[in-house]
């Protein structure tokens, strides 16, 4: 049974990350983590006619790859905890609509992957699920449309505007233990920190204080 120590939850079952997958676009493939991705794509439209559908394809591919690498069947996955940067988490819902796996939509902006891992681990700890997936996605072009200006508008980006990743990541978490796989033994959920950042383009500055403020 999980135990609380201050604001930290200690997980007795230590859910194990038995597989993971990451896919990304051209720009990400050229960065320092380029060789770490399972797949990268020169064409970031993913053959789709809008950016939201492109992001959907990224998440779908990441989840399918992670499940395949886990040697599990989709019927063995109890639930998927996933989210993205789009309204109503449509990237997640459209990616999962043909998989027939129970799903929970989550929204934590740039913390969605960490949030999905936390909730997934708690679901294993509860005994309700045996094997679940945690996933998230984003796409530079759909994020610009959602939070700044559509690329078609041709607006000039400010120097403080971050570049949102085009990619998706997924992890399969299980109650099964492995001597070589990482596991989740503690989770710590953060609080809202508002430092009064007024530059709407500089989302990184608004989020950074939460990353550095750790309380026992």
Regions found by a protein language model. Name each.
Residues 111, 126-140, 146-152, 158:
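Glycine-rich anion/phosphate-binding loop at the beta-strand->alpha-helix junction
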């Amino acid at each position: 049974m999980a135990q609380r120590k201050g604001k930290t939850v200690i997980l007795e079952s230590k859910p194990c990350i038995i597989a993971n997958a990451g896919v990304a676009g051209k720009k990400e493939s050229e960065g320092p983590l380029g060789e770490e991705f399972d797949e990268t794509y020169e064409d970031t439209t993913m053959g789709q006619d809008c950016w939201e559908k492109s992001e959907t394809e990224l998440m779908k591919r990441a989840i399918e790859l992670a499940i395949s690498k886990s040697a599990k069947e989709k019927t063995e996955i109890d639930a998927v905890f996933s989210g993205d940067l789009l309204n109503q988490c449509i990237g997640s819902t459209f990616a999962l609509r043909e998989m027939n796996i129970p799903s929970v939509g989550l929204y934590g902006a740039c913390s969605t992957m960490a949030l999905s891992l936390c909730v997934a681990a708690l679901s294993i700890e509860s005994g309700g699920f045996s094997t679940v997936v945690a996933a998230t996605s984003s796409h530079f072009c759909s994020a610009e449309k959602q939070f700044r200006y559509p690329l078609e508008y041709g607006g000039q980006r400010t120097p403080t505007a971050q570049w949102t990743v085009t990619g998706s990541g997924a992890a399969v978490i299980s109650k099964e233990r492995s001597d070589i796989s990482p596991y989740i033994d503690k989770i710590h959920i953060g609080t809202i920190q508002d430092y009064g950042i007024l530059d709407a383009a500089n989302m990184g500055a608004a989020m950074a204080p939460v990353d550095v403020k750790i309380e026992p």
